C-alpha cells in the first residue's frame, strides 16, 4: 500500500481520536503493520507508546499519554463507540487529579478504574477494580475520568498522604458550589477510620486546616 493511500484511509479515524490511532484500528481499516512502519520511517506518524501512533500533522497535547493508554486498553474499538460503554475503564486516582488540575498528586503510574477485573502488562500502567456509578464519571479531554468528588475520596481510601489530598480538596473547593461540598464533607468524614483516625474524627475539617483554608 502506498503511503498516501494509507494516510488517506487513516485520516478520518485519527481526526476523531485527537490525531491518534492504535495498530488494531489501523489494521481493521486495511492499514497493516508494515504500512504503519513505513509511515513512521517517512515521518508521517510518530509512536506515542507501544501500538499507538500520532499523526505528525496533529499537535501533541498535555493529556496525550493518558489518552493513548486509554485507547490502547481497548485498542480494537474506536473512541466514539467506547464513550457509550459504561463498563469501560475510567482514569482515576492521581491520574484523574492531574487531568482535572486538582492538587499535585503524581499522575504516574497512569491509573484506570474498571468495574470488571482487567489486566495489562504495559509498564507504567495500573488497573484498579472498584465499583463505579454513572454520576461518578465525567469526560476530561475525551477521557472518561472519575468525578472531582470521587477523585477526592479515592486517594484517602488508598491511604495517600493527607497533606497531598488536602491540596486536591483545596482545588476542588475552588470550583464547586456549597451544595456539592456538603455532600463531599460527609463522605470524607465517613472514611476517617480507614485513614487510621478514631470514629467521629472530623477529617474534612482537618484537611481544610492542612490546606490552610
Language model: regions and residue ranges:
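Short gly/ser-rich loop at a beta-strand->alpha-helix junction or flexible surface loop bordering the NTP-binding
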Residues: 2-8, 15-147, 151-154, 158-186, ...
